[in-house]
Amino acid sequence: MKLILACSVAFISSASLVLFLRRVALHVGLVDAPGGRKQHEGKIPLVGGLAMFSGFAFGVLLLAEPLTSYRSLMAAMALLVIIGTVDDLSGLSPFAKFIWQTVAALLMTSWGGVGVAQLGDLLGMGQVQLGSWAIPFTVMCVIGVINATNMSDGLDGLAGGIAM
């Protein structure tokens, strides 16, 4: 029941924040114009990531679990939201984005202990253990997911829909 409540609050607060932040973004010029791989029509406010992160954070707070287990994830997500907003406002170089994505992934893996330790039984010969490659592999996976999500954001709501 607690999980359903937390998910409901996360969804409702994210949706509400999108509506509120949309007006703010249009007012301050935090918008994306169509062109290139971006197929949307008109200027689109760039606030989906901030709204979804905030909604997720509200939901996590309602779980009443020890927040220490979420600290590294929340810090990494907050860093990515900040870097994404800075990139949307002023444009960061691909190298700078890669560095910050790596820092966020390392926050989760090194500080939070989150990682892919084994790949399962891929070859039918037993579990493939990553050992000392677990952190580098996880960092590469996280960076890959971040960039795949970013690349899918050329159509209105596609990245947000995939994330949900």
Report each predicted region and the residues it spans.
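"…together with the soluble PPM/PP2C metallo-phosphatase catalytic core" -> "…together
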Residues: M1-M164
